């Protein structure tokens, strides 16, 4: 059981590294189950709860590459319970375009809680609770 927990946590760590280093959506979409559903709850950037399927996640990644020069996720805490991994992370994104009062090259910071549920070794459900610093 411990090995399975370690494997799931490592998959999430690898997924996050792929997000940080992405050059194309295949770098991270390989971690997703074909029937993935990602839910992002309201925050500074997303005013309403947003649900994304795989094709939506690919499109969001393309948009993200236009907004960010680079991004980093520093994992503060992580927990595994059954087929679920919970991660608390500090997010830093370096902007490529102006967002609110931030200019290109400025850092956008947030505190994330992310919940990943796995099915057949892939991320099947993902829930994001993102708390951004006020940049408007």
Where do the protein language model's features map onto the residues?
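Short, charge-rich amphipathic segments
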Residues: 1-2, 13, 41-54, 95-96, ...
């Amino acid at each position: 059981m411990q090995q399975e927990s370690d494997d799931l946590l490592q998959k999430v760590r690898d997924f996050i590294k792929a997000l940080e280093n992405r050059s194309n959506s295949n770098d991270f979409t390989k971690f997703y189950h074909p029937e993935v559903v990602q839910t992002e709850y309201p925050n500074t950037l997303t005013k309403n709860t947003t649900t994304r399927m795989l094709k939506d996640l690919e499109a969001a990644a393309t948009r993200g590459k236009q907004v960010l020069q680079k991004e980093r996720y520093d994992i503060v805490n992580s927990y595994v319970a059954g087929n679920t991994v919970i991660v608390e992370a500090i997010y830093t994104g370096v902007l490529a375009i102006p967002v609110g009062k931030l200019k290109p090259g400025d850092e956008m910071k947030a505190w994330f809680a992310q919940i990943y549920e796995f099915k057949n070794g892939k991320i099947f459900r993902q829930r994001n609770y993102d708390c951004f610093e006020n940049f408007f």
